[in-house]
Amino acid sequence: MLNKMKIESQLAQIGSIKEPVTGAVSYPIYQATAFRHPKLGQSTGFDYSRSKSPTRSVLEEAAAQLEAGDAAFACSSGMAALQTVFTLFSHGDHLIVSLDLYGGTYRLLERIMTRFGVTASYVDTNDLDAMSERLQPNTKAILVETPTNPLMMITDLELVSSWAKDRGLLTIVDNTLLTPFFQRPIELGADIVVHSATKYLGGHNDVLAGLIIAKGEQLCAELAFLHNSIGAVLGPQDSFLLMRGMKTLALRMERHEYNATAIANYLLEHEAVEEVYYPALRNHPGHSIQNKQSSGNTGIFSFRLKDARYVEPILRHIKLIAFAESLGGVESLMTYPAVQTHADIPEEIRRAIGVDDRLLRLSVGIEHVDDLIADLEQALTAAKQELQ
């Protein structure tokens, strides 16, 4: 029944009808690692919690439904989810990856996966000619972030998924920034979706989690084997917290988008700001593609200051907005990508994509937008006065 309802109803009802014994509206935390067998050769469906646990199973069922996949796998972090997906590949395999990429993903690919002989080429995934140039006989998959972090570049998922499918490649999409509330990559042709569920899905900066959602029986079976064998699974407490956060995802994403759009437009007109990178703005190069494949916009964007000397005093003077290294929570956070989230990416790549010493990233929370703008205004004013 739930899968026929609107996504708002699906989210609010996660786990609420899954506990038949007591009728608990909130699905309980099964803090157990082992489960009794009725008799030899029989199982309740749960044996050992690394392989499967009741609380995590309810979360995974909900995630698969929301992302239109056949199965989902909850991991101990977003990086654990990516690591599990990357172990689909073997020594000698090659991946094509979005050029503008989260620094942690780049670090995992370049400093860990290369040890096992898996290599990657980084390319603008909107440029099919450039991707074709990087295509190798041993290429197995394409990994896409859309929007990218932090420059908010948009990739046409239908186009890229079709291109990949024609060449026998898997399409993996990081959907962290939009969530299934605004974008469902599997419906657009992707094979695998990954999330840092720590971010918008959890939404409260209090749970570390990752999700993998996949389509196709064979692919799901292989991921289930890897998920169990690697063992970077999500525990019952964190599974419960993630489900609790997801129940309010619709309300939060709508407020994130509303606030971010208002603040992006405010900064666009500010004398200290050179450029704002946010797909909701009409001048954004990916605006039309974003509107075609997504029903809304994320709550995160980046902006470039005219003078790098503004950065330090702005970060020192913000009060309501926290200078902290994450995104997607109800609290607003500001980050300096060049020295934080993207510090592991070589400087020449950072500069090529625009992650320089003038770029700040703002994860807009659900506070009142007037208070957030007032905080930015006073910080920008204070920074200007210090530089005079």
Where is each model-derived feature located?
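N-terminal glycine-rich, Lys/His-bearing helix-loop that initiates the first secondary-structure elements
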Residues: 1-46, 388
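Conserved PLP-enzyme active-site core in the AAT-like
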Residues: 2, 13, 72-272
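Glycine-rich phosphate/pyrophosphate-binding loop
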Residues: 29, 37-58, 333-358
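Conserved N-terminal alpha-helix of the aminotransferase class I/II PLP-enzyme fold
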Residues: 34-83, 87-88, 104-111
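Glycine-centered tight turns that cap/initiate beta-strands
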Residues: 68, 138, 272-275, 320, ...
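PLP-dependent enzyme catalytic core of the Aspartate aminotransferase-like
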Residues: 119, 133, 137, 252, ...
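Short, well-ordered beta-strand elements within core beta-sheets of diverse protein domains
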Residues: 242-251, 298-306, 361-365
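Conserved small-domain helix->loop->beta segment predominantly found in fold-type I
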Residues: 261-325, 345-351
